Amino acid sequence: MPTKPHINLITSGHVDAGKSTLVGRILYDTGAIRDEELRKLKEIATELKKETFEFAFVMDRVKEERERGLTIDIMHRPFETQKWFFTLIDAPGHRDFVKNMITGASQADASIFVISAKPGEGIQEQTKEHAWLLKVLGINQLLVVLNKMDAANYDQKRFDEVKAEATKLLQGIGYKVAEILFIPVSAYLGENIAKKSDKMPWYN
């Protein structure tokens, strides 16, 4: 039986765009995390008054990361689909830990580039820096995830607006945007992660 092709995937993007939550949700929805593990993480998140962080805590395992609600170091976690075997590399978005992001990106074949679609967020400082770093490090395969669509009421206009901003940014750096897929999601609520969301019928 032939082995599945393997890809190292790093999450990238601004701090608080929802990268760790997205990784946790992908792992849960693909069966790489059991319900029992998620239940325990939810209890920890509640104790720390971080009620929506259970998916992020799948990868954010260090006490300081959980207390501060942000990723500090890189973390690896495997998962597989019917056709592919992946190693997800969760990387920090905060500017103080950009060296750790570079370490993770140097191990990656492609990136899930996460941008918040929440009104008032969108393209931010580390969004730009991470995009530039990925290009410099030779990562030309991007999947752009526009997260927090629930905070934008799943509005197509908001998706198109942030997509246009991201397109301008990535083209300016030298990416072939025609080859990049843009996906609207709500990582925390699991919309458009493992299956198509009925909240965004406008997206094909």
List the model feature ranges, each with a label.
Residues 6, 84-87, 91-97, 106-131, ...:
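Conserved Switch II/interswitch segment of TRAFAC-class P-loop GTPases
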Residues 11-13, 146, 184:
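Flexible glycine-/small-residue-rich
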Residues 2-99, 108-111, 115-118:
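P-loop NTPase switch module centered on the Walker A-proximal segment
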Residues 20-23, 142-149, 190-193:
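Acidic/polar active-site rim loop that often engages polyanionic ligands
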Residues 152-204:
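Canonical P-loop GTPase G-domain recognition
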Residues 22-26, 37-40, 100, 129-133, ...:
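Alpha-helical scaffold elements adjacent to nucleotide-binding pockets in ATP/GTP-utilizing enzyme cores
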